[in-house]
Regions:
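A short, active-site helix/loop in glycosyltransferases that binds the activated sugar's phosphate group
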Residues: 178-206
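N-terminal subdomain of nucleotide-sugar transferases
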Residues: 1-65, 182, 214, 252-254
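Catalytic binding pocket for nucleotide-activated donors in carbohydrate/polymer assembly enzymes
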Residues: 303, 307-389
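A conserved catalytic-core segment of Leloir-type glycosyltransferases
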Residues: 43-107
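Membrane-proximal helix-turn-helix segments that form the acceptor-binding/catalytic region
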Residues: 23, 107, 117, 136, ...
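Conserved donor-binding/catalytic core segment of Leloir-type glycosyltransferases
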Residues: 223-242
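Nucleotide-activated donor-binding/catalytic signature segment of Leloir-type glycosyltransferases, i.e.
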Residues: 266, 273-297
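Short N-terminal targeting/anchoring amphipathic segment
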Residues: 116-137, 151
Length: 406
């Protein structure tokens, strides 16, 4: 099968969605499929090469500058006049903002559509699949004049995404689905397609596709037995969705005497600077913030950790794929839950080295202190993890993807 995936890392160069798609593409390529990638990138952070796949690139440095100046339109942050002043420093960003906010015709959609039509004419793809979110690629594919089957892989929802207000909501998403042959969704999104639900009319087009997360952990030397004990988080922080406050509170309560170093890699700290400063004042060098790191660096950090930290989402219809990367590492997983119906809980119940703590739990710090002493140094063999979660093995995910598109 000749397949083209559209990957969008303009907003987030270390996007977990892009990583998931790259893993699926690699497995499909190894299975004998002809796989191409159209990478929409920010002009500053190229994606790593994927052996065997043919890569085509479109750079959108203008939209990167626009997003940085306008702070991605998030509430709070800098006053609007300050954002506009920053925007005016970059003529290409001003043009990008005009196209997006006034003309409602983002260059990313228009240029991607033209590139899709050109590539389809040249390579005669059987399937073109846009990986979402972001959804710019999906909207480009929606009206592209191509012969290939059109599909999207919704690793994050559109209308039901509670992190932002999606333009057009459910009617716009249904319109998009009407132009597609198939849509792959997460298990958490199934309810949107149930009888009487907003997207029920498209139910026959959607198929659940699990995260292709279980890859062997990075081969790294273990740190010395007398070196610091590490609890590691790798991921982005978002106000109202995934916040670090509960984790920082717990490790401040453990204090320096615990001997544990909390390392939290990833972006979003500008929204939580005060909490981070308070934690740094208590823990000093035992609180590390290396910032965003490439996927391979994150895998190395996870392989060298003693415990992996997962921050539960504040919504019940999105599940961070990084949880399954943690499982693949085989390390003990500390999950901090902030809602009762956390979609991660059923998976954590299947993982024998997991501890779940709930926000507001009075004895959480004491429980954590005891658990850290019990699990430090433990690790599940990779094969055992695959037996626990066979649906997350990339080859199984690839087989499902192909089965629904044949």
């Amino acid at each position: 099968m000749r397949i083209l995936f559209i990957l969008d890392s303009v907003e987030n160069p270390t996007s977990a969605n892009v990583l998931m798609a790259q893993r699926l593409a690699g497995v499909l390529c190894a299975a004998g499929h002809a796989v191409h990638l159209l990478e929409l990138w920010d002009g500053l952070h190229p994606q790593p090469e994927l052996p065997g796949c043919t890569v085509h690139c479109l750079a959108f440095a203008d939209e990167r500058l626009m997003n940085a100046a306008l702070e991605n339109g998030r509430s709070g942050g800098s006053p609007i006049p300050v954002r506009l002043a920053r925007l005016c420093c970059h003529p290409t960003a001003v043009a990008a903002a005009f196209r997006q906010l006034v003309l409602h015709a983002p260059r990313r959609v228009l240029d991607t559509r033209r590139e899709l039509e050109k590539l389809d004419a040249a390579f005669h793809f059987e399937v073109i699949c846009a990986v979402c979110a972001p959804y710019r690629a999906a909207f480009a594919l929606e009206t592209a004049q191509v012969q290939a089957k059109k599909a999207i892989w919704q690793l994050d929802p559109y209308a039901s995404n509670r992190d932002y207000q999606a333009p057009g909501g459910y009617p716009r998403e249904l319109e998009l689905l009407n132009h597609l042959a198939a849509a792959f969704i997460t298990r958490q999104a199934v309810g949107d397609y149930a009888p009487g639900a907003p997207l029920a009319a498209a139910a026959e087009k959607v198929h659940v596709l699990d995260f292709p997360s279980l890859v062997p952990p990075a081969a790294v030397p273990n740190h010395a037995a007398d070196s610091k004990k590490r609890c590691v988080f790798c991921g982005s922080l978002y106000p109202g969705l995934r916040e670090p406050g509960f984790a920082l509170e717990l490790f401040r309560a453990l204090g320096l005497a615990s001997g544990w170093t909390l390392t939290m890699a990833g972006g979003g700290w500008q929204y939580f600077a005060a909490d981070a400063a308070q934690t740094k004042a208590v823990l000093g060098e035992q609180f590390e913030q290396p910032g965003p790191v490439p996927a391979e660096t994150a895998r190395t950090m996870q392989a060298q950790a003693d415990v992996l930290l997962n921050l539960g989402n504040a919504v019940d219809n999105q599940l961070p794929s990084k949880l399954f990367d943690y499982f693949a590492a085989g390390k003990p997983v500390l999950h901090l839950c902030v809602i009762e119906n956390d979609p991660a809980l059923p998976y954590l119940a299947r993982y024998p080295l997991a501890l779940v703590l709930h926000q507001g739990q009075a004895d959480a710090a004491d429980i954590l202190h005891c658990w850290l002493g019990e699990v430090c140094g433990k690790q599940l063999p990779f094969g055992e993890v695959c037996d626990l979660f066979p649906e997350l093995v990339p080859q199984a995910v690839a087989a499902e993807f192909v089965r629904w598109l044949m």
